[in-house]
Amino acid sequence: MILLINSHVKAAGKDHILSVEQAAELEDVDCIIVLGCQVRDVGSLSHMLRDRLICGMEVYKAGAAPKLLMSGDHGRVDYNEVGAMKRYATQNGVPSEDVFMDHAGFSTYESVYRAKEVFEAEKVIIVTQKYHLYRALYIAKQFGVDAYGVSADLNTYVGQTMRDFREVLARC
């Protein structure tokens, strides 16, 4: 049953995963959602988050959408994914006014829900690693969001086998 559900979620999203160039050809996209990921104690980015931001900024600079929505965990004073994300984007040429921050994107579900219900996004491009994109796109479809994804797999990541296993279970 788990494998059947996993296959269904992957099949539902595979045709919506695009290259940066394909994403730039979409019309009327409200924003590019960059999903949060771990930041270290001093606020430095994990490799996965840095790659998500690099890809998100590339999609933005290609003209795919007018705004970036950084969605991540800022549930504690001493932990701020979205602050680190915005800082990285603005230090790399994205105007501050083009970066929105969702401080309550504690999960993929919450990030997509809040993009629609709080930020009123109807058509989005989601940027995260490919293993994660399938579920993000599936959730967006369930909320009625017209969503496309761009994979941020710029590197090989330590612990990916465990993340892949966890993701299969998360899709159920």
Model-derived segments and spans:
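Hydrophobic membrane-insertion alpha-helices, especially the h-region
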Residues: 1-4
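A structural signal for short, hydrophobic/glycine-enriched beta-strand patches
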Residues: 6-165
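Carbohydrate-recognition loop of C-type lectin domains
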Residues: 172
